[in-house]
Amino acid sequence: MQHIRNFSIIAHIDHGKSTLADRLIQYCGGLSEREMESQVLDSMDLERERGITIKAQTAALHYRAKDGQRYNLNLIDTPGHVDFSYEVSRSLSACEGALLVVDASQGVEAQTVANCYTALDLNVEVVPVLNKIDLPAADPDNARSEIEDVIGVDASEAVLCSAKTGLGIEEVLEAIVARVPAPKGDPAAPLKALIIDSWFDNYVGVVMLVRVVDGVLKPKDRILLMSTAAQYPCDQVGVFTPKSVAREELSAGEVGFVIAGIKELEAAKVGDTITLATRPAAEPLPGFKEIKPQVFAGLYPVESSEYDQLRDSLEKLRLNDAALQFEPEVSQALGFGFRCGFLGLLHMDIVQERLEREFDMDLITTAPTVVYEVVLNNGDIIHVENPAKLPEVGKYAEIREPIITATIFLPQEYVGPVITLCNLKRGSQIDMRYHGRQVQLIYELPMNEVVMDFFDKLKSVSRGYASLDYEFKEYRSADLVKLDLMVGGEKVDALSVIVHRASAQYRGRELAAKLRGLIPRQMFDVAVQAAIGSHIIARETIKALRKNVLAKCYGGDITRKKKLLEKQKEGKKRMKQVGNVEIPQEAFLAVLRVDEGK
């Protein structure tokens, strides 16, 4: 026990977590030269391509320290992106220590702070590491003072290293051994193991990544999952040295995997406690809070015959992604599909991309929306995540929208444009602090303003230097209305959006104009209208294509021409009564791309 160290690496995106993990694995001989590749722990193609970590991964390393002892180091690599912050808290709850990696040239950024506070809340020992000191722009002293200023962690003994060149890696390992406490736990007590993560493997079923707190777990033991009371025979236990290696047993303080022939992922819930059926623990370990999706969007197959395939694909994805939620829904415009819940926009983007890549699906996505609280006239409260499900205008007393608290870090010179952007998005400033060259802005913003395109806009007004972290605060009453779009007098449910009354006229006009350009011309006039309730606020007309019926009259009598024109008019009128308009895929995406106040 004294020679085990469990630690994870936390940092802002692109501060070098995965590279540092590579170096530590290489230094401790976890993989041979041939198997070593960059970002070993990012196993998904998508993770590699975007250069982000999505799933937390682990590696068990052996390190002979300068005091001559051999230590077992369990490394858990965590994602840095705000959408995956729950992955971070899960990883941290399995550790006693965390390496706080800060890019010496960038200083402290938003996720650095958020993740570090998560670590401190869980009583994890934080070891600051200044990375990228080989860069000419590196300024370790400034980074040190920012860590002390902003986070309040003592950084006088921060380790300097460069994960790219391998400089200072030994010092990092020594710091882990010296400063991270050994795990506490009793190998003789009844087994308690926390499930940190679980995923589905095609050959062995569900693989659970666990941290053993008390007791010992061996193959052939019957295990009991405490939240569902289900029992399974344990087939295999082991550790990842990124590759999986089977072991005789996992004992208190260790992190490893358990395979127990479980077929469905729902059975192995993350945050659940595993114990032995023969000698169960009295009470489970404190788990994690359930993750609630923040952003909803409809996913529909382009070919309606692929509906079943889409359902299977979503179910397979959910095996690896506990946060994804979906339920079937029907849209008059798009047919059968699913309403999916995501943690944020990046998560939505990634799920969509994985469906298209790994499962070959062609998808139509509707505009992302957040969950609104609607107070009905009789006082009942319902939650609405789909604009089409909003009750009619007289049926409810008020709509409340989710408000988030956003923390934005940015260099001083971009404060003006960022404040302007936040005000455009109906934000209210709570606080503003200066830390050296960096400014920390704290704003309250309505979540549906953030969902659309806030992140992209923030990056563009600050040239990519601003970083954002947000958390849900509360539901607050607002003057919101449902904007319907009608094509040829028919409501298109998939194009409805919920907007603030102040920007409704503008949005309505913009959307109608956009759709006019996207819907192909028909043989008859098509009206594109934006409406709030029964009140039409904007209209555009798609002009009909017409044949020149007078081409065959050379000269001739005016009454003859009139007769032909009248006949054409009659025909168009009849077509208009029976004609229906095909709406192209681009039209659904247009809803996403209407810019607020240009």
Swiss-Prot record:
**Record field: transmembrane:** none
Superkingdom field = Bacteria
Tell me which residues bind GTP.
14-19, 131-134
Keyword field: Cell inner membrane, Cell membrane, GTP-binding, Hydrolase, Membrane, Nucleotide-binding, Protein biosynthesis
The record's catalysed reaction(s) read:
GTP + H2O = GDP + phosphate + H(+)
Q: Per UniProt, what is the membrane topology?
A: Peripheral membrane protein
Cell compartment(s), UniProt = Cell inner membrane
Q: Which GO terms describe its molecular function?
A: GTP binding; GTPase activity; guanosine tetraphosphate binding; ribosome binding; translation elongation factor activity
Question: Quick one: where is this thing mainly located?
Answer: membrane
**Its GO biological process terms?**
positive regulation of translation
Family as reported in the entry's similarity comment: Belongs to the TRAFAC class translation factor GTPase superfamily. Classic translation factor GTPase family. LepA subfamily.
Stated name of the protein: Elongation factor 4
Q: Which organism is it from?
A: Azoarcus sp. (strain BH72)
Question: What would be the name of the gene that encodes this protein?
Answer: lepA
